[in-house]
């Protein structure tokens, strides 16, 4: 799967979405919560990215585990929406 952390569609206010470049923020959060070397390496790829980042399903699940409690729920939802190919309000809670 591919996620572009430079173009996350984040709900910044109720029912208002903005596209934000959060690759460094997400990369640092994944790095801080990385339980394995593989997730540490993913964090570095995200942090250094200038566009979409390719990752396996296992890496994606590791990313979600690493950022749980590290990032705002709205940012995590933006990551999930992009991974699922869903925009805006259509995302599941």
Q: What is each stretch, according to the model?
A:
Residues 1-93:
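Positively charged, low-complexity terminal tracts
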